[in-house]
Amino acid sequence: MSTELFSSTREEGSSGSGPSFRSNQRKMLNLLLERDTSFTVCPDVPRTPVGKFLGDSANLSILSGGTPKRCLDLSNLSSGEITATQLTTSADLDETGHLDSSGLQEVHLAGMNHDQHLMKCSPAQLLCSTPNGLDRGHRKRDAMCSSSANKENDNGNLVDSEMKYLGSPITTVPKLDKNPNLGEDQAEEISDELMEFSLKDQEAKVSRSGLYRSPSMPENLNRPRLKQVEKFKDNTIPDKVKKKYFSGQGKLRKGLCLKKTVSLCDITITQMLEEDSNQGHLIGDFSKVCALPTVSGKHQDLKYVNPETVAALLSGKFQGLIEKFYVIDCRYPYEYLGGHIQGALNLYSQEELFNFFLKKPIVPLDTQKRIIIVFHCEFSSERGPRMCRCLREEDRSLNQYPALYYPELYILKGGYRDFFPEYMELCEPQSYCPMHHQDHKTELLRCRSQSKVQEGERQLREQIALLVKDMSP
């Protein structure tokens, strides 16, 4: 029976160009199943012939054979197929006429490899795969086609490489024809998808590289251009209306951005600034606001008034607030005699100043009215401010802080030099004698030496007073 089986398969394999491997395998297995009565088939689940054959291999007696008696004949693998005759000659039968176990294993491996190659090269799987997978499939198919075409030239080398690649000693991959159903439209769609993927990758690379571009390097001129937004034909909104709308919206946004709410911190800061400004307008004992309008001057700790205010004071415009005022001319006697403000007192030394104001302090009869003292010299830069500070310091020492005998002290800004040209009629005599006059050089030296002695005596008295305070318990 076995001889008839293999002779029939040999005749069928030799006739024509030869059927495929799977048809020959099925015929051979069906004949074996008819011969072997001990082979049982499960009718519940349909299986392939190879699966049936291997599933019940434990019950087969034909699998307990020896090794093959002859080597495989692989000379006919260049055609891409193998016939049943070549299979029977390569896998010998034992004495009982059954196939050897090694032959059956080779048949199983050949069937598995053939099924895998058919699944890999199916058109449906190629169409459903990604572009990268499609590209790899094309490369594998081209490689297999080129290898099958060159088998006729180099038989031995290509057989080894083909067997290593396929993992089977029997079967080879047949050359697959191109899918006839794959039309030009599908090919164009695949190429368009590949182009879109490549463009996206290029844009991502350009955007990432732009972050690390050096400022000194020139810009890349080969950057992809941005797509211009095409205007729709159905859009009937005029451009002027659009410009007006967006301009109005931009102004509204700017107004909202510039608006700032007042916080608690801002309120406290403004209150502190107002208090500081108000304190600058308060008198020395911080009880009232200054009666005369003040201006900024050279010394920030002193209050300055302009010539117009002094002229208004002399004309009696502040009688409702002021009971009595004094204009102290701190210049030397020859300057005072050369021209001075009406009613001004010439007190150029500290001793004279203290004796006039502090030996017997002047107190206003009306508590609601005030006593004002205005100091000046030629420019009101040194002598006038110095005498004003001396009187304030001595007044502080005689009273308990913040009480003062004379809380309102002012400096005439610009001195007699600025007052005389504007208000000459308020001067007696109507003339002006500068300090460095050529006719009064000796008097200038005498007055300076006298003032220096007085200044030294004053500093000595202050030091003695400090020592007495330190020694007292």
From Swiss-Prot:
Database matches in PROSITE patterns: RHODANESE_3
Subcellular location: Nucleus
Reaction(s) catalysed by this chain's protein: O-phospho-L-tyrosyl-[protein] + H2O = L-tyrosyl-[protein] + phosphate
Impact noted for substituting residue 130 to A: Loss of phosphorylation. Severely impairs PLK1-binding
Post-translational note: Phosphorylated by CHEK1 and MAPK14 at Ser-216. This phosphorylation creates a binding site for 14-3-3 protein and inhibits the phosphatase. Phosphorylated by PLK4. Phosphorylated by PLK1, leading to activate the phosphatase activity. Phosphorylation by PLK3 at Ser-191 promotes nuclear translocation. Ser-198 is a minor phosphorylation site. Was initially reported to be phosphorylated by PLK3 at Ser-216. However, such phosphorylation by PLK3 was not confirmed by other groups.
EC number assigned by the record: 3.1.3.48
GO (cellular component) term, any one: cytosol
Residues carrying Phosphothreonine: 48, 67, 130
Stored PANTHER family: M-PHASE INDUCER PHOSPHATASE 3, M-PHASE INDUCER PHOSPHATASE DUAL SPECIFICITY PHOSPHATASE CDC25
Protein name, per record: M-phase inducer phosphatase 3
Lineage, uppermost ranks: Eukaryota, Metazoa, Chordata, Craniata, Vertebrata
